[in-house]
Amino acid sequence: ILSQIDEYNRQFDEVNAEILKLAMDGIDTQYIGGELAWPVPGYTRITSKYGMRTHPITGVYKLHTGVDIGAPMGANFVAANDGIVVKAGYNGAYGNMVIIDHGGGIQTLYAHGSEITVNVGDTVKRGETVVLKVGSTGYSTGAHAHFEVRINGVTTDPLPYITNGVVPSSENQNTEQTNTTASE
């Protein structure tokens, strides 16, 4: 299992390096500003917040780089803002994942999908374009939506960027992982 963890960490580092390269290449998009849309319409229960936690699979205490949203297999995972798909495919710990560049150094990542519904180069619309179907691929203990916000290639807590009338459920919003039924 340690070799698998090392491989997942290597793949994670590759994704981050690719994101930084794409950011440096200046993809021709412009961030339209404002808040990001809630990425899983109809599902607001956060099962794990951004921050330090004990990983439910590896048992390692480390940064959880996004938020996990409890949702059933096959639920729609939508673009949080207008942008261009810069990565769509399988990536180790993330499983099936999509990265969207919104311009201005802002990117969002959607992971653990059962089905990818966009391709690299596709233009997506805020709240309208389905980028993934919720699933449990990669390092996952159950169906859920893992959502990240990256500013200039660095992950940050997504919640301050999300407001469109959705107030996430307060269930299990501590930074320590206590419910491992649907987490990365």
Task: Show which residues each predicted segment covers.
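Alpha-helical oligomerization segments with coiled-coil/rod-like character
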Residues: I1-G34
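Catalytic cores of peptidoglycan-degrading enzymes
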Residues: G34-T180, E184
